[in-house]
Each structure stands twice: as C-alpha cells, then as structure tokens.
Amino acid sequence: MSLSITHEKSLIDNYIWILFDKSKAIVIDPGESEKIINFLDKNNLTLEFIFLTHGHCDHTKGVFSLKEKFPNASLFVPIGLELGLGESIIKEGDELNLLNSTFNVLELPGHTDNHIGIMYKDNLFCGDVLFSAGCGRVGSNYKDMYLSLKKIKSMDDKTKIYFSHEYTLDNLKFAHYIDPKNKNIINYIEVFKEKPDTVSAPTTLLLEKEINPFLRLSENIDIKNKINNEFDAFVYLRKLKDKFNSI
C-alpha cells in the first residue's frame, strides 16, 4: 500500500512534505511546526519520522517544536548536521523501512556540502538541489552541484520531483531568456499567467528535461560565449541566474 503525499506551505515559498498512512506520518524539511501539528491533529496522525535534507533554518526550524510534541519521532539528518535532538545520521546507500515502505538515501551535495535527497518509490524529495525550471544556489562548489544534477537527470523520466520552494515562475522567466524559442517554456509560463497561485510541485523529470536549462546543458552548450563543455556551461548559467533579476 502506498503512502499518501501532501504538503503544507511554509514561510514565504517553502513546501513541507508529509507522507502518511491511516495513523502515522513522516515529515520532510519542517521549516515551521504549527501548520504541521494542525494537519497531524486534524487527521489523527502521529508523527513517527522526520527527514532533513540539509541544515538551512527554513528547512529545520520547526523540528524543535515537533520533537517536543512528538518526542518519540525519529529524526534523520545528513552527515555533519548536529541539532542535539538524538538525530540519526543517514548517507548515500542507506535503505530505511518506515511505515512498511522503503526509503533510499542519495547524497546530493552542491547547495550545501552535505545535502541529501530521499527516494520513495518513484518520488524524489530533493530539498534545494533541483527546482522546476531551475536549481538551487551553489553553497559548496559548482562541481558538486553539477554532478548532483547529473545524478538526478540519470533517473527514470517518470520520477516525480518534490522540491522545497515555489520558484517556478521566476525560474521560467530565466529559462525563457536563455531559450526563447522553447515552446514548452512558453506554454508553462502561460499556465502561471492564468493561475498565478499554481502549485508546480511535484514536477516530473521528463518535464524538467524539456524546460530546465540546468538539465539542458547540451542544448545550451554554445550560449553567449561559445562554451564547449557541459560543466563550464553549468557554471556560466548558474552565475548568470544569480544576477538575473538585475539584468
């Protein structure tokens, strides 16, 4: 039996992911706690497990209150993240059986040097590594982020991508700037014009291969200054995106 998956919007543009069965729940990246507790209480759910993909406060701040209310909930964190809450470290290759379901851990450094992703069936919870039509800012080094995106790109096209921020419209504007004739990008922008509050998560890997410039490096290989390899193209695009709003 598959777990149900839903989200709560958090802070300005965060998504907190909740997976649950009839009585128990798993929470991923709780940037705040009140909405999560309300959801759990409303649905008579006990919080059993918490995952953190990385240590930024907009993904972790709610964990302290959640552990106060649910002290028996197990907390899983990447290597190097110490919160003093009895957390368990998880790493690449770990397989966890939770709520009669299998979860696999992927190391996806780049946004932070210890960032992880969580795979449940064909669902990837990727934190701040990949967004729809974009990717996270580089906080460790460009090579790490490039390789993490390549790892995701190698997955099955049917993979559902559960990212942690609703940046899609801004990302699409940059994608259109880079690839102005891409009809898939143009059509997706129209969706947001018609429904500005569109929730774009989860996306699919297939869609991202059509619209996301950071997964289309071979298509963008000769942009602007005739870059001739994918890694340099990635670095160029990521730096350009960092200053795009001022262009």
UniProtKB/Swiss-Prot annotation:
Pfam hit, one: Lactamase_B
EC number: 3.1.2.6
Cofactor list: Zn(2+)
Residues noted as binding Zn(2+) 2 in the record, renumbered to the chain: D58, H59, D128, H165
Function: Thiolesterase that catalyzes the hydrolysis of S-D-lactoyl-glutathione to form glutathione and D-lactic acid.
Family affiliation: Belongs to the metallo-beta-lactamase superfamily. Glyoxalase II family.
Protein name per the record: Hydroxyacylglutathione hydrolase 1
Organism from which the protein derives: Vibrio vulnificus (strain YJ016)
